[in-house]
Amino acid sequence: MKLHIGPGNTYLPGWINVDIFSNVRADIYSSALALPYERETFELIYASHVLEHFSRHMILAALTHWRDLLSSGGILRLAVPDFEAVCLYYLRTRELKNIMGLLYGGQDNDLNVHKVSFDQYTLTEMLEKVGFNEIRKWSWQETDHANYDDYSQAYLPYMNKEEGMLMSLNLEAVK
């Protein structure tokens, strides 16, 4: 089975879609920190632009919970705003208004706030700390959900996938 945490407007058919917000399409409504599943239930867990919404003190707890839900050899596929790419974009363009959402979240409700930033080194270190291995970047074009637009495909200038810079750090790790 495959679990999609925080689908927002991107419901993935054939997956179990879990969101905390009842105003989006999901199969289950739950906190991502207390998912109602047995250990080793899933072969793949996907969370696109979810992890940055937890306080930095809860990141390892979230990663540990998700690891426990994976079967042996299962994959955790993450997408988070890429702090390094965001900084490079800002230094090249000085367009702060274009990166506000990536840095701070949409802020249209109390939960849509980014509380932590990630770069590849830091997220890799956290994944290793909770027992993941084979940590690698993944390409949104090469997944079974490539045709479903979500923030793993976030580019600046906005959605310029040919000439823009990818603003999402896409990492996956094996249990």
Predicted segments with their positions:
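Conserved SAM-binding loop
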Residues: 2-88, 121, 171-175
